[in-house]
Amino acid sequence: DYEIEGNFRLYCTDVSLLLAMRDFGLKQAIVEGTLTGNTKGGLYESFVADALVKSGHALHFYRNETTKREIDFVIQGGGYVVPVEVKAGRAAANSLRAVMRSNEDIGLAYKVADANVGVSEDGVVTVPHYMAMYL
């Protein structure tokens, strides 16, 4: 696979400003812990994108049109391609695991989720959201 120059995603690099641009209902849902769906996922993706950029990473993403699989971020670590999947909750990272199975060159992958630090049998390293800045 290769990079397509005109294919990109935009993220707000200041999550506070992103929240300030939204209505009060969003802020209330965050405080009450009732935020759900694509809004919740998009907010967590923006937070992780901000952390990765501030850690010096260039942001790329992966999408396979045939299998409909997407990886939220692809960064470089130690000269290797490292996929990073962001989950707002504890959901499984099926796309991440499928990409790892189909590409033996990927030895390290991260799942950023509402979970503790851990490593699965297939080599996916899970880190909590607040540790995204350390990837």
Residue locations for each model-derived region?
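C-terminal helix of von Willebrand factor
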Residues: V127-L135
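Catalytic cores of nucleic-acid endonucleases
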Residues: A88-V127
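Short, glycine/charged-rich beta-strand-loop motifs at protein surfaces that mediate ligand recognition
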Residues: T36-G37, P83-K87
